[in-house]
């Protein structure tokens, strides 16, 4: 049996109890390596330059340099690192701001260990991840009647894209072929005038039309 490659993770949180607890839990998983920890975003950036993490799990509210402001610094200096925001806040303002700055994921602090691990695995594989509580918050605000140009099926596709699903996973969830899922993805971009998956995610957040499917 082939051993799973380790995912190098950097943890950043200004609460020592949270930081130590998260580190202890993640270290129980053989395929996750907590390569470094920091109590400040700036310190985390300095450590990141040395350890070159694949995933940065970072608190959103920190002194001196906030997690949101730090996202762009990580993207500029450590382009291989994927940033996941860890927060107590489920407001669209925080979520949208994080995505606009380049976060690959957003999870709430009350999620299970399994969900944190899923987030790490998903973003390390190039996807995006938003915890179930974040979906609930997004679903609480809908666009005005007639202002949404997407069909119900397109909204389902968009919701699955935001959840980081591959074309194969989208196909399995909706009972379509992978080729059809890819066509839907391309059509969404063309219809909305968006060229990247990140742009689709921003659109979904800004318009409050994310669907939780499956």
UniProtKB/Swiss-Prot annotation:
Coiled-coil segments on the chain, per record: none
SMART domains xref list: HTH_LUXR (SM00421), REC (SM00448)
Residue intervals of the Response regulatory domain: 8-124
Subcellular location(s) per record: Cytoplasm
UniProt GO cellular component terms: cytoplasm
Modified residues (4-aspartylphosphate): 59
Residue ranges constituting the HTH luxR-type domain according to the UniProt record: 143-208
DNA-binding as UniProt keyword: yes
Gene3D superfamilies named in the record: 3.40.50.2300
Name listed for the protein in its UniProt record: Transcriptional regulatory protein MctR
Gene field: mctR
């Amino acid at each position: 049996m082939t051993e799973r490659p380790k995912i190098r993770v950097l943890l950043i949180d200004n609460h020592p109890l949270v930081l130590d607890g998260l580190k202890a839990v993640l270290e129980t998983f053989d395929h996750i390596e907590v390569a470094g920890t920091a109590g400040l975003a700036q310190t985390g950036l300095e450590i990141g330059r040395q350890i070159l993490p694949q995933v940065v799990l970072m608190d959103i509210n920190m002194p001196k340099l906030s997690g949101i402001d730090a996202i762009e610094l990580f993207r500029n200096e450590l382009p291989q690192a994927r940033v996941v925001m860890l927060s107590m806040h489920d407001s669209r303002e925080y979520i949208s701001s994080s995505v606009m700055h380049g976060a690959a994921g957003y999870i709430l602090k009350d999620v299970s260990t399994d969900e944190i691990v899923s987030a790490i695995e998903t973003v390390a594989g190039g996807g995006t991840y938003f915890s179930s509580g974040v979906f609930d918050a997004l679903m609480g605000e809908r666009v005005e009647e007639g202002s949404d140009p997407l069909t119900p099926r397109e909204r389902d596709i968009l919701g699955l894209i935001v959840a980081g699903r591959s074309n194969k996973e989208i196909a399995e969830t909706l009972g379509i072929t992978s080729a059809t899922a890819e066509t839907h993805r391309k059509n969404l971009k063309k219809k909305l005038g968006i060229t990247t998956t990140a742009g689709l995610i921003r659109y979904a957040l800004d318009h409050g039309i994310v669907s939780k499917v499956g």
